[in-house]
């Protein structure tokens, strides 16, 4: 369907990772949630020039359930006025205690659309179709009908992530071309069912509806894990966290250091970044919002991002300048597979390691059968 050499999908917000993986025989998927129809062209122009004609895709995020659903023309600025004072003060106190000074919402977002804005996502896709993209993907629910129709009109497959069997059934019935069975080990927004259980459960559930390829996602860091998922019936592996520790990644050196030092138990599923359950690295930020008795609790999506994104950006900048308390606050989306990451590699090397690990696993299993 996609014309790739090795069914390793690399989701990344970094264009360098996307291009490197596609050139190496995998399939890079560019995360475009933070982009607009105007600035997406710069990113995709660069990818077009650096993939040697190899295929890549784009991922957007159109939540089915959004606190502002049905409201029109919402900007980050207009949302900011609706944030409760208790949440403002709590976030401000965390930053002040760490000696961190954030920018205002006005400086951070200006007149940009609200975070996770559905209308903006569809406009980004329209702009993306001016480039040779070979896949569009969506998370947090069934893609809107307009997105599925766009894909069909351009001959581009539509993928969507599912964290539960019932979600996958709805995706198959809606007409998506590829389902990503994302286990609870995954970084970012995820469900509660493990990858080992979810992959065969979804394959079994959608088979009577129609033939839909299912990719495995959630905690996959090695080629051996990829082989195991494909033994379960997956058509490939959708990965994310492993690329955060690459040389090319958009993550800061401080975060990469924290990743390498972390165990799988340090990847916690909390709401303190986006307002929806999302797995990220445990930090003073996540611990305060989740466990301090004076915490007002997370706001629903999209409000929470207006508090968290600038706060955590400012904390990262301060941490890079040597602020130890700010370093304690630093976090980012990452899955439980972080416990398997112990060094920083180039993206091409990661692809090669996946291939070798996959081959080694298949050879071991074949040898067991032969015995």
Task: Explain the meaning of each model-derived region.
Residues 74-90, 192-215, 221-371:
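Conserved active-site-proximal phosphate/metal-binding subdomains
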Residues 142, 220-221:
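Residue-level detector of alpha-helix initiation sites
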Residues 1-193, 197-209:
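Active-site entrance/lid segments in N-terminal catalytic domains of soluble metabolic enzymes
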């Amino acid at each position: 369907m996609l014309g790739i050499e090795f069914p390793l999908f690399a989701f990344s917000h970094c264009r360098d990772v996307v291009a490197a993986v596609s050139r190496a025989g995998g399939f890079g998927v560019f995360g475009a949630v933070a982009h607009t129809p105007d600035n997406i062209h710069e990113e995709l122009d660069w990818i077009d020039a650096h993939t040697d004609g190899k295929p890549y895709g784009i991922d957007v995020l159109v939540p089915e359930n959004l606190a502002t659903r049905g409201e029109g023309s919402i900007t980050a600025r207009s949302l900011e006025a609706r944030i409760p004072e208790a949440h403002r003060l709590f976030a401000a106190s965390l930053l002040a205690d760490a000696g961190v000074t954030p920018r205002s919402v006005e400086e951070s977002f200006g007149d940009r659309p609200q975070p996770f804005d559905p209308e903006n996502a569809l406009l980004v896709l329209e702009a993306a179709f001016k480039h040779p993209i070979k896949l569009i993907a969506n998370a947090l629910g069934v893609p809107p009908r307009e997105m599925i129709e766009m894909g069909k009109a351009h001959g581009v497959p539509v993928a969507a992530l599912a964290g539960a069997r019932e979600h996958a059934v709805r995706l198959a019935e809606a007409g998506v071309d590829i389902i990503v069975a994302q286990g609870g080990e995954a970084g970012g927004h995820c469900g509660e069912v493990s990858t080992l259980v979810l992959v065969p459960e979804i394959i079994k559930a959608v088979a009577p509806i129609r033939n839909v390829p299912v990719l495995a996602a959630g905690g996959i860091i090695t080629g051996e894990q990829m082989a195991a998922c494909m033994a379960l019936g997956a058509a490939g592996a959708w990965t994310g966290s492993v690329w955060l520790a690459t040389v090319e990644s958009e993550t800061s050196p401080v975060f990469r250091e924290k990743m390498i030092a972390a165990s799988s138990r340090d990847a916690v599923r909390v709401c303190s970044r986006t307002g929806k359950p999302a797995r990220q690295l445990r930090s003073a930020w996540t611990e305060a919002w989740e466990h301090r008795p004076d915490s007002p609790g997370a706001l629903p999506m999209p409000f929470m991002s207006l508090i968290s994104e600038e706060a955590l950006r400012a904390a990262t900048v301060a941490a890079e300048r040597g602020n130890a308390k700010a370093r304690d606050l630093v976090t980012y989306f990452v899955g439980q597979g972080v416990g398997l990451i112990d060094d920083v590699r180039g993206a091409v090397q990661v692809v090669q390691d996946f291939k070798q690990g996959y081959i080694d696993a298949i050879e071991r299993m074949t040898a067991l059968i032969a015995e």
